[in-house]
């Protein structure tokens, strides 16, 4: 079963037999940029910049997740735990993502949607007739992810010290980079690194869930039109690289600049 069939099967089971017909009704000609990737790769930052560049709406799957938690009367953390054992919440969020990609009701000419699964939901919407999608994957090294987390959660002094001392290598996993940082013997770093691993493990949880439920791996670059490695790059340089890649992939985006 390919992922298109997997998504259709799940939607019919959890949303309803007429769910696909309802999705077709949401399809407009409004183009969409779909950004995916792990946490700390720059998705949110670049989505905001792209929406400003093309005068579009900046939308996030994370917002749908928070809205669903509020509707159910649970915390975001509790809902994340429920996803591990309760089917249906995630399918509803993915269905809402597809409606978002369709563009019906969007109060802008286009949108930039970021999350982990938008590109593959976009692939499903393309199978229903949606056009004008650009699917982008942002990635970076485990070392870079750890440094970005430290920059956010510790002092500037500690961050710069770790950045200078941490070996310039692409660590194989989260635990290896955490152990290397622990060796630097900085106060509170151990607890920060534990939080980093817990935070990043959500990516693996989601990856496993999407594969089991739909049959796709959101890290599979075959599902994307543009792939950007953000390691050791400034925000402005990444934005420039993304824009150039989008407009090379589809020249019509040049005309969409305000």
Ranges and model annotations:
Residues 22-30:
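Phosphate-binding P-loop
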Residues 44:
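Walker A/P-loop
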Residues 38:
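P-loop (Walker A) phosphate-binding loop of NTP-binding proteins
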Residues 35:
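Hydrophobic anchor at the beta1->P-loop junction of P-loop NTPases
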Residues 41:
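ATP-binding Walker
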Residues 61-129, 142-147, 151-193, 197, ...:
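ATP-dependent small-molecule kinase phosphotransfer cores
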Residues 2-23, 186-193, 197-258:
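NTP-dependent small-molecule kinase module
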